Structure formats: C-alpha cells, structure tokens
Amino acid sequence: MAETIAGSNLSWGYQSSNESYACFSTNGSCPYAAARVLGGCTVHNGMVYLRGNPTDYNNWAAMGNEGWTWDEVKPFFLKAEDNGEIDRVGRFWHSTGGPLSVERFPYEPPFANAMLEAAEQAGFRISQDFNGDVLSGFGMVQSTTKNGVRRSSAASYLRPSRNRENLHVSLNSTVTRVIIEDGKAVGVEYFKNGEFKIVRTTREVILSAGNIKSPHILLLSGIGPQEHLESMGIAVVKDLPGVGSNYHDHVFFMLNFTINDPDTYENNWAAANEYLAFQTGPLSGHGITGIVAQLASSKTTPDYPDMQIYNIGYDAACAPGEIGALRSTGERSVDLASVLLHPKSRGRISLASNDPFEQPLIWSNILSEPSDLDILVEAINSAIKLTNTDAMRAYNMTLSVTAL
C-alpha cells in the first residue's frame, strides 16, 4: 500500500535535501512517506500496533511536558483500545470497548513461524507482547485490524462519529496557516475548491499535521525563528527558534533476501474468494509484517531497545489467474529493515518560500552522529544473523548483493 501511494497524488511527496552523510545514491535526497488522505499514514502503514517504550514518555515528561509520563498516558491507550485477544494479552496492559480494533493478523504464512524459530536459534528472546512487560526480542505483534481488515484512524474514529452535529470534516482541503489574534489561536485558514477560506473556533486549535507539516504550518503562521521568518517575508507573530529544529526520524536500511519455497501462490482466486466471504486466509494477513524485533544494542539495556527489525514481503506475488497455480521458480523475496530507534542526529525543517503550496525544505542530517551509524550496523548484523540458523537454512535464505 505504501509503495502504491508513494509518487501519487495521495502522497505529499516530501524529499530531503543536502544530505552529507546518507542518500548518496540519490544525490543527497531521500523520500519521506506521508499519506495525503483522511487518516494519514494509518491508511498505508504496516498496521503494526506498538505504543512506544515507557521510558520515552517519561523522558518527554522530564523535559517539562506535564502529563506525559507513561503512567499518565497509559489510561488513554487503554481507553482507545478494543483488543480482540484480551484473554491472551491480559487486561493489565490492554482493554476492550475502545474505538481502535487491535488483534493479530488472522493469517501468518509458515515462514513467519520459521523466523521466530530462527530468532530463538540465534539466541534472541521471544516476546509475546511488546506492549506488555517484555520489551525486547522477536515477536508476532498485534495490528490495527479487525477480522483481517485495516482499521485506519479515520475508520476507527471519524466514520462512527460522522453524523454528529458538532463534527464537520472538510475534504480536499489544505490548511495554510493558523490564525493568531492577541497571542491566541482563534482559527485556521485553508484552501479548498480554488479559494482560501477561514474557520474560527471559540475554544482551541489543535495542530496535528505530522512531524513535517506541523512545523511547516507554524512557520507559515509566523511562529518560528524570527530571522528565518523575516527572510521569507512573513510577519513574526512569535519568535520561537525551536520551531523546525531538532528534527529526527527513524533511520532504516533495507536488506533483501531470496528464499527457496516451492509453495503455491497464496494470492490466487481461491484466496480472494475466502477473503471476500470470511476475511480469513492469506489475504487477511500481511506477509511477514507481523514479525517484529525490538533489540538492544551494545549501547543500551534490554528494557530500552534502540534497534528494530521489521519485515516485508513473502506473499506479495499474485497467481497468473488459475486457481492453485504454482510458482515457476519457487523463489520468493523478503525484505528485512534494520531500524535505528533513538537517533542522536538532528536536522531541520524550514521554508523554501512563503508560498503554502511549496514543499518545505527538509534537512534530516541523518547519520551525522557516528554512534547512529554504529548502532545501525549492529541492527543490520542482527538481521543477517538470522540467516545463519537451521530454520533459515531450510529456506536457503540468501542475502541479495548489488555491486555499487
């Protein structure tokens, strides 16, 4: 889904620039996925349900963000959740009755279980629930799905409430700035059907446009570094040097592997009919996306993992048309993404101009801190370590190597 949206009019099409430590094969520019749809990235992401590490929340609270300790935010996670496997995961960490459906994918291919077996053979711990008390290891995670169907934030929250009199959703609209009067946010300006419009509020404005668009809107609204705003011809409402700075994001490196597997195509007409009728079978899963690793590098402890491995592929291919068609080669492809969870490198979001429709300048500055690269290499080696197990040798899991 993410690859389908990328490059289309359903994507913001963000690109970083002037990268000195990464993105060498693309002239110092890397793409940043962001869905331009109602529901945002929950419409195209991998649906994996991970709340984040409690230490992260406690660290944010220690920075002065009142109300953000793990003990303070946990009740809101529980309030949001409708866990379809509550008897398995327990009510201390999970709950039912909320708007967001959470459960494992109904279908996992045999290779997914083989990966867990390989993880054990490689010496990694197995976690039954990364949202519980075992925060590191390999595990089969829950997802934001219900009966094999994606549940985006729009489907979970907006669709059930769309007939409420106090809810108005403006589609095909782009917010261009927050309106500030006498030091208070009183509304927003937005563009729709070829014209700028304004909506006002009597209470508050909540800006929740993501880690790129939120600072972009603030800068366009005159909130940010004074010198930068003045250079763009924008009236300064509030001189806040921090707006747009301290940018950081998860860095990942994708490894492609081939495996020899003579199974039949999963995505055939029989699978389609099963999914349409019962929301079960191969199409109710997401390949090996349900297998995730949260690992601790040599620079941290198991209760605060700084590396992640998430997996893509295995059953993405489709049959030629006839039911039960066999693969011609028996060779499949899987991707293991090694992720840096707590990067120290910092970049910046800034304006290219005062035109709200011109993309902001994104300088991620990823891998500028040597320790980030060290940890990323550890994550890559952890992924490769899986191949040196009996469970993966049975699949002849082989790293694809492309000469530079």
Residue ranges of predicted features:
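N-terminal redox-cofactor-binding region of secreted/periplasmic oxidoreductases
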Residues: 1-404
